């Protein structure tokens, strides 16, 4: 019996989680109760991709990947603006990683893009693309249950080419944490020629800020907006992160900043609270 982690854009809704859990347990053998963890994604497959890569890497480095299944579902059905018959969504796929961790769910957008190079085998399970507005409750549990009970050999699946997973090009907001730090999809190697204290211009949406490049997120004084190698991404090339060490004793501002000074604004607030998936432009100041 494997355990399950769910990464989905409905995972912050208690009713949806309960309905999914009830349906899944109903498909499992009696007295089988896997641990189920939920990680909420924004309505962006780029955010889901970022979360997936981080969960996979942590599980492979510190956990037991061969004892876990990841179920992803952020299928915004953005492939068409036309009417969708029978609520049809992206096809359900199963990816077996080299670490033996299993990742499954709709192959929607960029959800699998950041773990593409870790996939050893890639399959499609046909017949559950449509028929429900909440496929995670009504259609997917029967397949997920087989994976949890290690009965994937009983599933009628066809092998797929990895070319069906798009590459993620460009730089994006990957995640915004509860401190207001912006975790990007920019590898640290992009700024490897920069020195501590160099200025870099970062544009997210219609907001451009000059930020200091530092060797770590605490490399500048409180209240200074910095960009540095963070804690996410590949171990040998971490993603860059935008951060501010907030000064709890800073004096309040006036006007729009009443009750809050610039020194106490988080990185996210400096960029008008961007959403995961928003594109990032960066260029050096010489």
Annotate each predicted stretch with a short phrase.
Residues 1-73, 283:
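Alpha/propeptide regions of enzymes that mature by internal proteolysis
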Residues 2-5, 34-37, 67-71, 91-94, ...:
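Structural motif
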Residues 3, 29, 33-35, 43, ...:
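Active-site histidine-anchored catalytic micro-motif
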Residues 3, 272-286:
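Short, basic/aromatic-enriched C-terminal tail that caps enzymatic domains
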Residues 10-15, 77, 179-182:
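Short acidic, Gly/Ser-rich segments with clustered Asp/Glu that frequently serve as metal-coordination loops
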Residues 115-201:
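Anionic-ligand-binding alpha/beta catalytic cores of soluble enzymes and soluble regulatory domains
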Residues 185-273:
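A conserved acidic, glycine/proline-rich C-terminal tail/linker
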């Amino acid at each position: 019996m494997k355990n399950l982690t769910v990464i989905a854009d409905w995972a912050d809704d208690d009713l949806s989680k309960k309905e999914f859990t009830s349906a899944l347990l109903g498909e499992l053998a009696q007295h089988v109760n896997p641990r189920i963890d939920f990680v909420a994604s924004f309505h962006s497959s780029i955010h889901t991709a970022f979360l997936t890569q981080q969960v996979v890497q942590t599980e492979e480095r510190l956990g037991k990947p061969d004892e876990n299944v990841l179920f992803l579902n952020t299928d915004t059905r953005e492939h068409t603006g036309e009417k969708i018959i029978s609520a049809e969504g992206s096809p359900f796929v199963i990816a077996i990683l080299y670490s033996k961790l299993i990742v499954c769910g709709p192959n929607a957008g960029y959800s699998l893009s950041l773990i593409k190079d870790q996939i050893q085998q890639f399959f499609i399970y046909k017949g559950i693309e449509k028929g429900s507005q909440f496929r995670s409750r009504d259609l997917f549990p029967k397949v997920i249950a087989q994976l949890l009970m290690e009965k994937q050999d009983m599933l009628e699946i066809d092998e797929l080419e990895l070319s069906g997973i798009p590459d993620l090009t460009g730089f994006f907001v990957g995640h915004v944490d509860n401190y207001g730090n912006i975790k990007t999809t920019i590898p640290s190697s992009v700024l490897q020629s920069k020195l501590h204290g160099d200025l870099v211009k970062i544009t997210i949406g219609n907001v451009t800020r000059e930020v200091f490049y530092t060797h770590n997120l605490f490399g500048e004084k409180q209240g200074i907006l910095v960009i540095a190698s963070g804690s996410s991404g590949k171990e040998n090339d971490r993603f860059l992160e935008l951060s501010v060490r907030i000064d709890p004793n800073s004096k309040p501002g006036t006007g729009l900043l009443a009750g809050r000074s610039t020194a106490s604004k988080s990185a996210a607030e400096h960029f008008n609270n961007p959403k995961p998936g928003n594109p990032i432009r960066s260029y050096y100041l010489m």
